[in-house]
């Protein structure tokens, strides 16, 4: 049974039993604690935690998953992989143990012609938690599994929790006996190589308390709502149903291995070392395609680093196999060919996926040879000196200059019997980051070093900031910098940095951007100020352009800020304080500020949270903020000692350093924070605050984007206009729109199903005529042809199998049909048993056809699929298939 059919049967089985089919979520987890989705239940986590009420009682999905903790083992064993698909069924307060167990048994053991997987019940073994009498009773008394095939295991194996206080419960695993050739008997408690786990049923019925690890924690009691979370590894079940030894030999993986062997000339099974490389390439290319398809791009941090690491590992292993040129495009084509039916977005997004992958391949190939030479020299030098540890600076050089991920260096060094000084590498990386941070600040402020500013400060003293009370000031120019160097003067058109003895300009800090405005010199010169920074303590630097005249040190000037812009920024900054306090009231003190940025009419606020904030909580926070605005609370700023400020409960701003005297901004009885920024005088001046939403920006950190004042009103006005337009189109009140739109979408879905049914029937109507057109080639009934453009891969496969079934009389039959999808050729070829007995295998025929089409393909001996780039070559591909049939048929 093909992987696509396993997936289809899973979803169909549970949909027929009242489950809502939920499409696979993106691999980019909507959870700050996770880099990538590692399990099928992750998209449902908010429902299990009670953060969001689920819109259904039952759900089922086939979720894309990526796990990378054992990436170094991928290829070395046949059990490790980074990408897999997790089939799951979920119940939220609906059915519980008996429902989950009976559903699982029915699907696994029902005959294949009845929609099941047709597994032999005698080969299924069950494990339950050691104290779960109820689960064992259901398995034995209700399902009928003999007691000798039910084993009890402890918390380590058969109890599930998230590792923190929250839902937990016992689980029951279904294991398949692969036979005596895989080891001794005795069940999964004795041999997990022979008895392979295929399905895990988790019974979430208890609340976990504090504790350590997977075993040492307290059970606080039963949950008010008992839930079901199950997971079945699709690739593992495919391994069993397809009768192969491991997951690398199933249809979706073997096609990639076949392409890699075609590109390198190294056959799978020739040698242990080459088999390892072929498995690495197969797994990592599948993972790469799925990650890029979900929007991940190669980089040096987070998900981007995971992708870069596995891509470069795959490329290097192709080189070890003998590839000399670019290979990823060919491999991507095969992956999409095998996975595109289940995930059609891969086909739609093929061009972007290939573009991202090719860019990474080209970048790595440019440096791989040189980097490998550097590493080989370093390894030789280390061994020659009797050392066993590669120096950290060598690993840093490979990373910094040649783009080698540290993991690749570790792996390549280990192949030569060396370890790597990782501490030294990390120290050098830290020093580089600190230099980069300093360089970025220098670029931002436009200075080449702090010396010039300190020199000005030594001569003229610190800048007197009067911007809390004044928008203008009479000032003296005490310093001018042009191109980062001190200058006595600057002329019209020069980009300059001006230092004044006194200024109303706020310098960027505390999340508030710098002021803009003008400096008018008594001589008539005018400087447009575009930013204000404070590169060294006490010195305010006004960055801008001399618009008119000449500016000299010592000249008198009038400095004035853009007051309208300043007020808009002040509204945003005060709104940030209100948002911070409202979040702390809603979520507790853990919702501490982790950064902010205040701009005219809008702000963003970063805060700590282990998970997404529920929509209902966000609505309450927004309402509370606007209620404070309506209370007309005064905003006051006081300077006091740091100890007094702490005594009053003032909250410190993220990332700021404070002296003995601090400025405390108080908003009525609602908020009190240490802050050096500018603010409104009364909350009514904010007018309106609209929170646009929150999202994850890193592990444990969320970000809120918001609008203030006129910007918030304009946003709501636009939304109101859209709602009014929808009312006109749908003929309903605003509160009726969700229900009406949902009903319309339901009708649309039904119509699409009817169209799909009609289209499939039209395609199959052609089957009879095609079967009648069979051509005799050395006693083989050969059917070839091109069907209408745009026929889907699924429909083409159905048509091919239908035509094959119409050729009767025990004749050997080969059916090879072609079409084009989005201008690119696609072929499906099938053979019957009589043809296979004469040496005709669909996979061989497809590879021949696909090669003629400028692409690749693969599959099983009875049916295979391929594609290419050159649709004009379909006629040549038909001829190539006919020649191969004539040459091969015994």
UniProtKB/Swiss-Prot annotation:
Gene3D superfamilies: 2.40.30.130, 3.10.310.40, 3.30.54.20, 6.10.250.550, Bira Bifunctional Protein, Domain 2, Threonyl-trna Synthetase, Chain A, domain 2. Zn(2+) binds at residues 573, 577, 675, 679. It is an enzyme of class 6 (ligase). GO terms for cellular component: cytosol. It is found in: Cytoplasm. Keywords: Aminoacyl-tRNA synthetase, ATP-binding, Cytoplasm, Ligase, Metal-binding, Nucleotide-binding, Protein biosynthesis, RNA-binding, tRNA-binding, Zinc. The keyword Nucleotide-binding applies. Signal peptide: none annotated. Its EC number is 6.1.1.7. One of its GO terms (biological process) is alanyl-tRNA aminoacylation. Its cofactor is Zn(2+). One of its GO terms (molecular function) is ATP binding. Consists of three domains; the N-terminal catalytic domain, the editing domain and the C-terminal C-Ala domain. The editing domain removes incorrectly charged amino acids, while the C-Ala domain, along with tRNA(Ala), serves as a bridge to cooperatively bring together the editing and aminoacylation centers thus stimulating deacylation of misacylated tRNAs. HAMAP family: Ala_tRNA_synth_B. Catalyzes the attachment of alanine to tRNA(Ala) in a two-step reaction: alanine is first activated by ATP to form Ala-AMP and then transferred to the acceptor end of tRNA(Ala). Also edits incorrectly charged Ser-tRNA(Ala) and Gly-tRNA(Ala) via its editing domain. This is Alanine--tRNA ligase. It comes from Streptomyces coelicolor (strain ATCC BAA-471 / A3(2) / M145). The lineage of its organism: Bacteria, Bacillati, Actinomycetota, Actinomycetes, Kitasatosporales. The gene is alaS.
């Amino acid at each position: 049974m093909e992987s696509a059919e396993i997936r289809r049967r899973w979803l169909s089985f549970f949909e027929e039993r009242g489950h809502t089919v939920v499409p696979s979520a993106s691999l980019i987890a909507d959870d700050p604690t996770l880099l990538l989705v590692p399990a099928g239940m992750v998209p449902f986590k908010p429902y299990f935690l009670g953060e969001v009420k689920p819109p259904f009682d039952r759900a089922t999905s086939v979720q894309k998953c990526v796990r990378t903790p054992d990436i170094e083992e991928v290829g070395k064993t046949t059990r490790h992989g980074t990408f897999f698909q997790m089939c799951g069924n979920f119940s939220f307060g609906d059915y519980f143990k008996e429902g989950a167990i009976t559903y699982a048994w029915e699907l696994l053991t029902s005959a294949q012609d009845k929609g099941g997987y047709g597994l032999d019940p005698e080969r299924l073994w069950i494990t339950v938690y050691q104290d779960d009498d109820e689960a064992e009773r259901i398995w034995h008394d209700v399902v009928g599994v003999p007691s000798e095939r039910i084993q009890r295991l402890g918390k380590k194996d058969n109890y599930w929790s998230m590792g923190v206080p929250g839902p937990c419960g016992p689980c029951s695993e279904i294991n398949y006996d692969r036979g005596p050739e895989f080891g001794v008997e005795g069940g999964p408690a004795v041999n997990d190589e022979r008895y392979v786990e295929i399905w895990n049923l988790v019974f979430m019925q208890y609340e976990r308390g504090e504790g350590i690890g997977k075993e040492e924690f307290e059970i606080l009691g039963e949950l008010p709502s008992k839930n079901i979370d199950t997971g079945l590894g699709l690739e593992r079940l495919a391994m069993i149903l397809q009768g192969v030894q491991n997951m690398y030999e199933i249809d979706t993986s073997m096609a990639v291995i076949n392409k890699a062997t075609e590109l390198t000339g190294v056959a799978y099974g020739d040698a242990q070392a080459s088999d390892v490389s072929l498995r690495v390439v197969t797994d990592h290319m599948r993972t790469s395609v799925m990650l890029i398809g979900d929007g991940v791009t190669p980089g040096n941090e987070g998900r981007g680093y995971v992708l870069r690491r596995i891509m470069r590992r795959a490329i290097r292993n192709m080189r070890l196999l003998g590839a000399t040129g670019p290979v990823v495009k060919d491999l991507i084509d095969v992956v999409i060919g095998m996975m595109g039916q289940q995930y059609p977005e891969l086909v739609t997004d093929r061009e972007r996926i290939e573009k991202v992958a090719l860019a990474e391949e080209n970048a790595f190939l440019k440096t791989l040879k040189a980097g490998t030479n550097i590493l080989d020299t370093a390894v030789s030098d280390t061994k020659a000196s009797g050392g066993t540890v590669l120096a950290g600076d060598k690993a840093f050089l490979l990373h910094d200059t040649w783009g080698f991920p540290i993991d690749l260096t570790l792996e390549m060094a280990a192949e030569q019997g060396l370890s790597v000084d990782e501490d030294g590498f990390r120290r050098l990386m830290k020093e580089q980051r600190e230099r980069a941070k300093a360089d970025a600040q220098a670029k931002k402020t436009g200075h080449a070093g702090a010396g010039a500013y300190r020199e000005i400060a030594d001569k003229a003293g610190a800048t007197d900031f009067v911007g809390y009370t004044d928008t203008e000031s009479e000032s003296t120019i005490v310093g001018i910098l042009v191109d980062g160097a001190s200058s006595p003067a600057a002329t019209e058109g020069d980009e300059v940095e001006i230092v004044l003895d006194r200024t109303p300009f706020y310098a960027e800090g505390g999340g508030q951007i710098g002021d803009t405005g003008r400096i008018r010199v008594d001589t008539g010169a005018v400087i447009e100020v575009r930013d204000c920074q404070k590169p060294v303590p006490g010195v305010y630097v006004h960055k801008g352009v001399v618009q008119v005249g000449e500016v000299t040190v010592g000249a008198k000037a009038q400095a004035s800020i853009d007051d309208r812009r300043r007020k808009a920024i002040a509204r945003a900054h005060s709104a940030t304080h209100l948002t911070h306090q409202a979040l702390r009231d809603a979520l507790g003190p853990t919702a501490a500020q982790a950064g902010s940025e205040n701009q005219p009419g809008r702000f963003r606020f970063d805060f700590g949270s282990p998970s997404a904030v529920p929509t209902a909580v966000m609505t309450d926070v927004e309402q509370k903020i606007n209620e404070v605005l309506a209370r007309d609370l005064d905003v006051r700023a006081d300077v006091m000692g740091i100890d007094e400020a702490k005594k009053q409960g003032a909250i410190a701003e993220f990332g700021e350093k404070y002296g003995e005297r601090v400025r405390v901004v108080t908003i009525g009885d609602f908020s009190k924070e240490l802050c050096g920024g500018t603010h409104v005088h009364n909350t009514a001046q904010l007018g309106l605050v609209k929170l646009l939403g929150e999202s994850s920006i890193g592990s444990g950190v969320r970000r809120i984007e918001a609008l203030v004042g006129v910007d918030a009103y304009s946003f709501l006005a636009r939304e109101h206009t859209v709602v009014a337009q929808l009312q006109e189109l749908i003929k309903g009140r605003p509160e009726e729109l969700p229900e009406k739109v949902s009903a319309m979408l339901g009708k649309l879905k039904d119509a699409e199903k009817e169209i799909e049914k009609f289209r499939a029937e039209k395609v199959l109507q052609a089957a009879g005529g095609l079967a009648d057109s069979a051509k005799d080639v050395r006693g083989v009934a050969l059917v070839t042809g091109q069907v209408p453009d745009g026929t889907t891969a699924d429909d083409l496969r159905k048509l091919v199998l239908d035509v094959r079934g119409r050729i009767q009389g025990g004749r050997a039959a080969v059916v090879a049909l072609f079409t084009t999808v989005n201008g690119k050729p696609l072929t499906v070829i099938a053979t019957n048993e009589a043809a296979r007995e004469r040496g005709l295998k669909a996979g061989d025929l497809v590879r021949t056809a696909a090669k003629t089409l400028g692409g690749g393909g693969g599959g099983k001996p009875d049916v295979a699929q391929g594609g290419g780039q050159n649709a004009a070559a379909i006629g040549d591909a038909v001829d190539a298939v006919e020649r191969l049939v004539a040459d091969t048929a015994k």
